[in-house]
């Protein structure tokens, strides 16, 4: 069978940039297809309704609802509307664990979730953030999530759900992920060199802390002379996290130990480390 995977992208976080691409990296899988509906950059009710209506019309076996601050009313309503239509949902969002009441409600619900703690909010001040700065920040963040192992763990969790659908499960019978992507979880099993692991773990910890700095610069500081250097420093932190990730991967390359786990056309995941070798 061919599994239908929906991606409802509401606003933007770095995890949403790569969502469906991580499941079909060479666009040659024959066991699943994806459909993305996006609200664009905004989270207005009419934008979200457009996404939900298009997703309902397509009728996926399950839907990934990816957004910043996934406990906001808009994303919450979107997944509830999809669930009411019989579509199982997995929430992918940035760190909402500090929002105790809403996060407890999410944990107690039937929704799956993957909380990407390092997918930190951007320094969205007009005096600092132009289109190029925005793209540069997201590029650095994507690299952090990729090279620490966070993206692989996210992809593996989603592939588990695809495998369940292929095995005949559907609807409420699907076991959906409930994962908080900490630094330890991200780097687990990704590195043979302990120094590479330490660098990647440091990168993830730095990226996690960027959100707090940007919250201070975007919401807690009123004087522009003060908030500009605050958000600029947050972006410099993300750049340093990215550089640590590159150093970690270079160390792994030096001992020919970079882990690669491609999909076969059937969806089976194979693995290799030595560069000049075939995945098995």
UniProtKB/Swiss-Prot annotation:
InterPro entries, per database record: MTD (IPR002844), MTD_sf (IPR036080)
Alphabetic keyword roster: Methanogenesis, One-carbon metabolism, Oxidoreductase
NCBIfam families: PRK00994.1 (NF002162)
Biochemical pathway: One-carbon metabolism; methanogenesis from CO(2); 5,10-methylene-5,6,7,8-tetrahydromethanopterin from 5,10-methenyl-5,6,7,8-tetrahydromethanopterin (coenzyme F420 route): step 1/1
Gene Ontology molecular functions: ferredoxin hydrogenase activity; methylenetetrahydromethanopterin dehydrogenase activity
Name of the protein this chain belongs to: F420-dependent methylenetetrahydromethanopterin dehydrogenase
Lineage: Archaea, Methanobacteriati, Methanobacteriota, Stenosarchaea group, Methanomicrobia
Family membership: Belongs to the MTD family.
A single GO BP: methanogenesis, from carbon dioxide
EC code: 1.5.98.1
Catalytic activity: 5,10-methylenetetrahydromethanopterin + oxidized coenzyme F420-(gamma-L-Glu)(n) + 2 H(+) = 5,10-methenyl-5,6,7,8-tetrahydromethanopterin + reduced coenzyme F420-(gamma-L-Glu)(n)
